[in-house]
Amino acid sequence: MALWIRFLPLLALLILWEPRPAQAFVKQHLCGSHLVEALYLVCGERGFFYTPMSRREVEDPQVAQLELGGGPGAGDLQTLALEVARQKRGIVDQCCTSICSLYQLENYCN
C-alpha cells in the first residue's frame, strides 16, 4: 500500500504531461527538411508548390533590380516593385523566420 502511494504523484505527473492530439502541432518554427516533411504531411497526395529564391537573390538587392530591367534611377515603378517584393511573405518567412500553423501550411498545397 505504501509503495502505491509513493507512485501516485509520478502517475499524476505522467498523465498531465501526455500530449493532446489537438495541441501536438499548434504553431511551430519549421525550417529545411522539417518544413518539407510538414508540407508532405498536410498536403498528402495533392502535393505542394514551393519555389525558393536563390541565396544570391536574397542577399543582393541589385540582382533583383537588374532582373526588373533597370539600373540606378530607373524610376518609381521599379522602386515600387522592389518594395512589394520585399513585403511578399513566403513560406520560409512565415514558418521558419516566424511561426506557422497547419492551416497556414495548407495555403501552399496544390
From Swiss-Prot:
GO terms for molecular function: hormone activity; identical protein binding; insulin receptor binding; insulin-like growth factor receptor binding; protease binding; zinc ion binding. Disulfide bonds join C31-C96, C43-C109, C95-C100. GO terms for cellular component: cytoplasm; cytosol; extracellular space; nucleus; secretory granule; sno(s)RNA-containing ribonucleoprotein complex. Residues 1-24 form the signal peptide. GO terms for biological process: acute-phase response; alpha-beta T cell activation; ER overload response; fatty acid homeostasis; G protein-coupled receptor signaling pathway; glucose homeostasis; glucose metabolic process; glycoprotein biosynthetic process. The keyword Disulfide bond applies. Transmembrane segments: none annotated. It is found in: Secreted. Keywords: Carbohydrate metabolism, Cleavage on pair of basic residues, Disulfide bond, Glucose metabolism, Hormone, Secreted, Signal. The keyword Signal applies. It comes from the Eukaryota. InterPro entries: Insulin, Insulin-like, Insulin-like_sf, Insulin_CS, Insulin_family. Heterodimer of a B chain and an A chain linked by two disulfide bonds. Belongs to the insulin family. This is Insulin-2. It comes from Rattus norvegicus (Rat).
